[in-house]
């Protein structure tokens, strides 16, 4: 994703990740040059949009939060992440745990100081785990949400975060049934990854200015996910989640989506696609069952409710803000955060509402026990053809000289008449490379 100077910390689509010891990364000189060109173009195009309004930048900064506690050993850590925790002074036994993921160029401490999560951890008694990536992983300190080596179950950064949750249980006595995850921008996109890859670990998640799971498969496609966004059917998005953990039958995590109406970096269309993805996973329609507005700024909330009466998915559209975490500095019960750092935007305390959605203040009951409802599946159809023919037939798209399967986004290789694949369609409009027998 584009290179961004430290004063502009939030765009989630990074340049090609740096190689890690023992984890070779793909991409040669041509890709690096292409990324450099894209970086320059996008930085020029979005630089002004990444600067918060003057009233936000000049807002007074409260005293910084207490320094986080670094955890030096929590597992094999295949993603080479760093683990920090905020532990309330009186952490109860079997406390919930919330994993928090920062945006590009940010740090765990900066996210803790400005997001307001620690305020509610101290108030309600839950542990916050802050995962932090480094420039050794990614030049812009973005989580690698679009890289197969990091966004799949058991691999890379996703596996490292999973190990952090397990360590929280063994070291701090947290309740493994009450683990949640949230993040901003690239951290929001990685939140989507974790909910899809480890649905049995995370009871709920909150994606702030993020991207649906399965959208980006490489650097180039990641740009398209950010803007203009990718339109897929709810069934296709849901299938991407199910494919992340084949055979898993539920229950599925509850998901809250937060997005600024004026976000120029990760366009608001992504909130719609996230809604489509997770409502379909839960077997729900895309028409809200309840709508409301939240004070103090008339944030528009849409809720999608299970047959048992519980909100499985909610979308919160924040008026008048761009790309960042909504905060509301102050000492009131619904206030939190600071706005002295870019991409923490004065509007509404999203951490207050996210904490409520997670049920950490006692306002949400335990999930119903009815089994999840999956949409009906249709028999798969298969086609064997060249990449050129797949694109002509609408089963694939082409970008930068390569072909990508429509729906799944799988890289089919060079766009020509020589490379041939068998593509399977299930559900309608979602194509994947067929493995094994294909009817």
Tell me what each language-model feature is.
Residues 257-259, 263:
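Short beta-strand/loop motif that positions the catalytic acidic residue
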Residues 113, 117, 169-171, 176-250:
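Primarily recognizes the serine-hydrolase "nucleophile elbow" in alpha/beta-hydrolase
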Residues 91-139, 215:
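Short substrate-entry loop that stabilizes the transition state in hydrolases
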Residues 370-439:
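Tryptophan-rich substrate-binding surfaces of secreted polymer-degrading and adhesive proteins
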Residues 2-8, 20, 29, 33-37, ...:
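A domain-start/cap signature at the N-terminus of enzymes
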Residues 132-156, 218-219:
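Cap/lid segment of the alpha/beta-hydrolase catalytic domain
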Residues 149-172, 193:
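Alpha/beta-hydrolase active-site loop
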Residues 99-105, 209, 259, 319:
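The conserved beta1-alpha1 loop
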């Amino acid at each position: 994703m584009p290179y961004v100077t430290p004063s502009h910390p939030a765009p989630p689509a990074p340049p090609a990740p740096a190689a890690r010891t023992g984890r070779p990364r793909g991409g040669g000189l041509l890709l690096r040059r292409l990324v450099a060109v894209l970086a320059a173009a996008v930085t020029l195009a979005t630089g002004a949009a990444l600067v918060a309004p003057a009233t936000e930048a000049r807002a007074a900064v409260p005293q910084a939060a207490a320094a986080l506690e670094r955890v030096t050993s929590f597992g094999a850590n295949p993603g080479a992440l760093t683990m920090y925790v905020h532990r309330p002074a009186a952490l109860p036994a079997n406390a919930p745990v919330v994993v928090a993921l920062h945006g590009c160029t940010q740090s765990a401490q900066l996210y803790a100081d400005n997001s307001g999560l620690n305020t509610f951890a101290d108030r309600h008694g839950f542990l916050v785990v802050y995962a932090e990536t480094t420039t050794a992983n990614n030049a812009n300190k973005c989580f690698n949400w679009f890289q197969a080596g990091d966004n799949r179950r058991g691999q890379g950064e996703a596996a490292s975060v999973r190990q952090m949750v397990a360590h929280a249980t063994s070291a701090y006595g947290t309740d493994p049934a009450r683990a949640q995850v949230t993040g901003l921008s690239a951290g929001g996109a990685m939140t989507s990854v974790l909910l899809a890859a480890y649905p049995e670990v995370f009871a709920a998640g909150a994606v702030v200015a993020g991207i649906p799971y399965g959208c980006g498969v490489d650097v180039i496609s990641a740009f398209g996910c950010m803007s203009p966004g990718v339109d897929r059917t709810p069934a296709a998005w849901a299938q991407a989640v199910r494919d992340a953990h084949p055979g898993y039958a539920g229950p599925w995590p509850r998901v809250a989506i937060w997005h600024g109406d004026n976000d120029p970096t990760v366009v608001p269309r992504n909130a719609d696609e996230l809604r489509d993805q997770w409502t379909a996973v839960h077997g729900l329609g895309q028409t809200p069952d309840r709508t409301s507005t939240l004070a103090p700024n008339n944030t528009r909330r849409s809720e999608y409710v299970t047959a048992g009466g519980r909100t499985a998915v909610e979308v919160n559209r924040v008026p008048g803000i761009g790309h960042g975490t909504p905060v509301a500095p102050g000492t009131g019960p619904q206030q939190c955060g600071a706005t002295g750092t870019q991409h923490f935007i004065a509007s509404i305390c999203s951490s207050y509402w996210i904490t409520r959605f997670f049920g950490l203040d006692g306002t949400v009951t335990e999930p119903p026990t009815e089994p999840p409802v999956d949409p009906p599946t249709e028999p798969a159809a298969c086609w064997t053809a060249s990449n050129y023919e797949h694109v002509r037939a609408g089963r694939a798209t082409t970008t930068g000289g390569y072909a990508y399967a429509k729906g799944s986004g799988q890289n089919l290789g060079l766009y020509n008449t020589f490379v041939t694949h068998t593509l399977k369609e299930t559900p309608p409009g979602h194509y994947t490379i067929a493995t094994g027998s294909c009817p």
